[in-house]
Structures are given as C-alpha cells and as structure tokens.
Amino acid sequence: DSALQELSAILDGMHVSEKEISSGVIKVPKYRSLYIDNSLKDSDMIKVDRDSSFKDIIRGIRNVKDSDFAVPPALKSTLRNYQKTGFRWMKTMAAYGFSGILADDMGIGKTLQVITLLEDERLQCKDSLSLVVCPSSLILNWQSEIEKFSKTLTSIIISGSSDERKVQI
C-alpha cells in the first residue's frame, strides 16, 4: 500500500522507533515541524490533525516578513528591508525556541542585523547580557559597529592568550 510506504518513509526520516509507533504516541521535537508539514502537505493518502501550536509554528516560520516583531526605533531607518526580514527571522527562531544560522554573501549587513537583535533584547530586558564569538580579525569591526549603530549596547573585547583572557574575564 503506497500510503503505508509514504508514512514509513516519513517516520524513518524522523527516526521514530517501533516502540513509539506501537505505543500510539509519537513525540516529535518542534524543530521537525517544517519537515513534517512539508512531507505531509501534498499527501492525499495520509490524514493528519495539526493542533493550533503546530499550525502557529508553521505559520510563523513561513510568514516571517509579516511577523509582529518591530525593529527597534533607533535602527528602523538604518536597516534595509532584507535586513529587517533577517532581524524578524532571528526573532521568530528565538520565539519558537529554535536556533539558526544567519548566512549570506559577505558585506551585506549580518553584523548590523545581529546588533539589531541584541539591541531589541536589551530593550526587552535591561539586564540582558550577550556574548559574540567571532574571529579575531573581526573583533574591532564588531566593536566599531556596535558603537556606530547602538546607543544602549556596550562592548568589551576579550582577546589575547589564554592567560590574558582569564585576567580580562
């Protein structure tokens, strides 16, 4: 039966055990939501009920541009539209408890997008602390960009040998 083969392939892709299948309860991590939705959306043979939280995750991730996450006022006019979308994507990932990698061509503003995220986190929680880990060749650039674009963030560079870093910390 092709429906069973299709379902078996999906369950294999999610590494669902026979024990879970036998129990009738399959718990799937949130990060698999898109995989499940994509695997099942075109299937006429498999009936799946999606609860409201599942639908919310899918809707949120698929409609990042339309999210309610507002760019901090101090940076709103600085960011280009694609950078605002990048900021909203990072906020969406964080809202659902996901991680992500912001990657694109070099020189189109990832640092500024992350500074915008950090600025927003600071506005939401004054006591928030963040750690940026970057190649030593970019440390001064990060500090310069923070000073240039943020009035609320402060930065401290911790670099040097292991012993020097221990003293700085």
Where are these regions (language model features)?
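Charged, low-complexity
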Residues: D1-G100, K148, L153
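Short, glycine/charged-enriched secondary-structure capping and boundary segments
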Residues: I108, I115-L117, E145-F149
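Walker A/P-loop NTP-binding motif
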Residues: R88-Y96, T111-K126
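Phosphate-binding Walker
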Residues: D105, L112-I115, S137
